[in-house]
Regions:
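Basic- and aromatic-enriched surface patches that contact anionic nucleotides/nucleic acids
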Residues: 58-185
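Short alpha-helical hairpin
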Residues: 34-54
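N-terminal extension/subdomain marker
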Residues: 1-36
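A general marker of short, structured functional hotspots
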Residues: 16, 43-44, 53, 121, ...
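Residues that form generic nucleotide/phosphate-binding pockets
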Residues: 14, 41, 46, 75, ...
């Protein structure tokens, strides 16, 4: 039987790592958002995801098993209380996740259908993803799709002539649900 660690979902590739000290004196922004929408977590959709980083010193984002990932995504979709993700903005304008990498990565995984085996992960691991990681990702995807549904299904429900009524209500709610942010200086 595999160890518990081997059953955890590896979401480490979903937030780029960067030296916490990396800095450039070009930051002039003083206003910061107070929450992140799920649409900001899509690849190539906006400014947030390309700017977000995880400090090199932080642990790997691979401590949650499939059930915990599913439960968190379900809690978000249902509009339940989610603790704030703590962020810090560098002088270069990079956004570092100080606390909440697993929460943020789980939502990025859902929005992009990458549970450690797709676009982000393939790029970071240069196409070399271990078979056990692929299997864990597949199992996680199946559980998420069964218990929550695919992110793309929620998007499709908004324009469908005959959507699933429950999915449609949740899709409409996702327009106003966001992950809260706390900024530190």
């Amino acid at each position: 039987m595999p160890s518990k660690k081997n059953r955890n979902v590896n979401l480490d590739a979903l937030i780029q790592r960067e030296d916490f000290e990396a800095s450039d004196e070009n930051n002039t922004s003083t206003s910061k958002v107070s929450s992140i929408s799920i649409r900001d977590m899509k690849i190539n959709n906006g400014f947030f995801l390309p700017s977000v980083r995880k400090p090199d010193f932080q642990r790997e984002t691979a401590d949650w098993d499939a059930e915990k990932v599913v439960h968190f995504i379900q809690s978000f979709v249902n509009g339940e209380f989610i603790p704030s993700v703590i962020l810090w903005r560098s002088q270069a304008g990079l956004i570092f996740v100080i606390d909440g990498s697993h929460r943020l990565s789980s939502l990025i995984a859902w929005a992009n259908d990458d549970y450690g085996d797709k676009e982000f992960s393939l790029e970071v691991y240069e196409g070399e993803i271990p078979n056990d990681q692929k299997q864990i990702a597949k199992t996680t995807r199946e559980k998420v799709n069964k218990e929550v549904g695919q992110y793309s299904d929620y998007i499709a429900a908004l324009s469908s002539k005959h959507p699933d009524p429950e999915v449609l209500v949740k899709a409409r709610n996702l327009a106003t649900i966001a992950l809260p942010i706390q900024w530190i200086d």
